[in-house]
Regions:
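A generic "folded-domain core" signal
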Residues: 1-127
Length: 127
């Protein structure tokens, strides 16, 4: 209707997370999304409850291949869904991601502590 195009690239985690009731856990999904209305977004999703707020200046730890651990700010979706978070510093993240084969993201979850999600990104097609 608007004549615009959104672009997506997603990858599922190699490992599964297990959480207590009522959350199911399972594989996480890392999605890169570019839309005309809000630009580039990095979205991490799992059936759990992330603890990440831009108001508290929360961060996720990210490791690209065997490189050093890096910190990226994170924020919650505007609709307050707890099973999703947005990773800030999108351009820096994508620049590192394009050169990597493996990415490990560590985030904090409500009553579950910090958990790591590993992604094989060697075949991720993002332009």
């Amino acid at each position: 209707m608007r004549g615009t195009t959104a672009r997506y690239a997603s990858v599922t985690s190699e490992n599964k997370l297990s959480f207590g009731f009522p959350y199911k856990g399972g594989n996480a999904t890392l999605t890169l999304r570019r839309r005309p209305e809000d630009g580039l977004n990095i979205i991490l999703e799992v059936k759990g409850q992330f603890l990440c707020s831009s108001f508290r200046n929360d961060r996720v730890a990210v490791k690209f291949d065997d490189g050093p651990i890096q910190r990226f700010g994170c924020s919650e979706p505007s609709d307050a869904r707890t099973g999703e978070l947005f990773i800030n510093g999108e351009n820096r993240f994508v620049a590192k991601l394009k050169k990597a084969r493996t990415v490990i993201i560590e985030a904090e979850f409500y009553q579950e502590g910090r958990r790591q999600m590993q992604f094989d990104v060697a075949g991720l097609d993002w332009k």
